Every structure is written in C-alpha cells, then in structure tokens.
Amino acid sequence: MNAEKKMLRHAFGKAAVHYDHVADIQRDVGARLMAASVIDDIPATVLDAGCGTGHGLQLISIRWPQAKVIALDFAAPMLRRIPADDAMAICGDIEALPLASESIDLMWSSLAMQWCDAAQVVREAQHVLRDGGYLVASTLGPGTFAELRRAFVGVDDFQHTNDFADVGALRRALVDGCLTPLTIRRVELVRHYADLRSLLASVRDLGANHVAARNRRRGLMGKSAWRRFAANFERMRTSSGLPLTYDTYLLIARK
C-alpha cells in the first residue's frame, strides 16, 4: 500500500466515529444505485467493496435476503462499526481483493471507487466475479466539489479537490476490463449548508478531505487567504444556503 493510500485509510479511519451522522449523501446515492439495479438474477454471494460502516449492507439484505454477504473495507475502524451478524467482514483493498477468482456473483461498491484507480477496480471485479456476475457501483465525477474549486480561484495555486474520472474514462475502464456496461447514469446532487464551516466539516467528517495531489496545501491557511476564500464562497449562497455539488455516476456492468 503506497503512502497516499495509507493517508486516505487514516482519514477514513478517523471519520468512522462521525460517519453515520453525516453520511446523508452516501445513503442517498446508495438508494439510487439500488433502484437503478434492475437485475433479475438472484446472487448467492455479494461483496460490498468499500463498505464503510455498512449502510449498503442494509440495502443488500433487503434486496437479496438469502445472499451470503462479504463486507470489505481498508479502514478497520469502519468495519468495527458493522454488527457481526450483518456480514463476514474483511479488512482489505478493493484494488487488490483478497478473494478467490470467480467467487462472487455481485460486487457492490457505492462511493468508494473514486478514491482508487477505476481501471484497477474493474480488473479486480472481473477477477472475482463469476461468469454472468454483476458490478454495481457508484462513484464521483469531475464536477464534484466544483464550488470549492471556484472559491479558491485567486486565493492560492494549490489543488484543493481530487481529480475524479469522467464518464469516458469510466466507460473505458469497464470495456477494457472485459465487463459489459449495462447502465452508466449521471446524477448531480447538491447539498446546502448554513455556513462555510459546517460545509467543510461535512466533507472532513466523511473522510473526503484528503487530496491526493502533489501540489495540495500541506499547512494551515492564513487569515487573509481564508477571508478571500470565504468571501468567494459566500457569493455562491442561494436561498437554501451554501451549495456543494456531488457529481455522481451509477454504473452497472456484467461479466
């Protein structure tokens, strides 16, 4: 595991204690992903890859109550919050799944792929899925946190958000990984916050504040820079509050 991934794992491990209280976006996207999963087959074994604290497990157990479910996450504190009876928990990396070839009927992964190399995740899915098995995933697209990027214009030259794969890259990852795309659907979700600190806290408490970029800010922002950043963001305020966009993609593919 490289240094960036270790830092990301640490960020999500720290977020575990707050995660369920602020994971509104994960619950929303998970429900949308399940609704989009028009799959007639009944999977015997389901992997929740990047399961977090286990919200997806609830959706899976309702949809496929007879399935054997494996919950996998690389942050052990997340796994410790999952009731023991809900699934077999494995601490592991979705870019290097510790599972046997062709051992899974359906791989579910909601809002985890964006922290990884999408092509590698698809290759791992192709490896563990049985013939005819499904990858059902959601991920973030390049429009995510667009407001943060706009607010930092003229403040500094650091990169403050991650680079997320666009629809073309996602489609290529599926096809190159020998999976047949069945659904690729974009859903733009916007959340609103009363003030900037609560907006930033929501990102931090989800563990999504780690930026994997060479030119990311490594120290604290100065008071002058903060004031300019806050003023820029305030100009985006609507009647609902300060907006923050989650540009999401729902992906369903078959081996």
What are these regions (language model features)?
Residues 134-198, 206-218:
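Conserved catalytic/acceptor-binding region of the Class I
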Residues 119-134:
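A short glycine-rich, Lys/Arg-flanked "PGG" loop and its adjoining helix->strand segment in the class I
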Residues 1-17:
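N-terminal, positively charged/glycine-rich alpha-helical extensions of SAM-dependent methyltransferases
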Residues 45-97:
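Class I SAM-dependent methyltransferase SAM/SAH-binding core
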Residues 53-55, 183-255:
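Conserved Class I S-adenosyl-L-methionine
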Residues 24-43:
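Conserved alpha-helix/loop element of class I SAM-dependent methyltransferases that forms part
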Residues 95-107:
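A short acidic, Gly/Pro-enriched loop at the edge of an enzyme's catalytic core
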Residues 105-119:
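A short SAM/SAH-binding and catalytic strip from SAM-dependent methyltransferases
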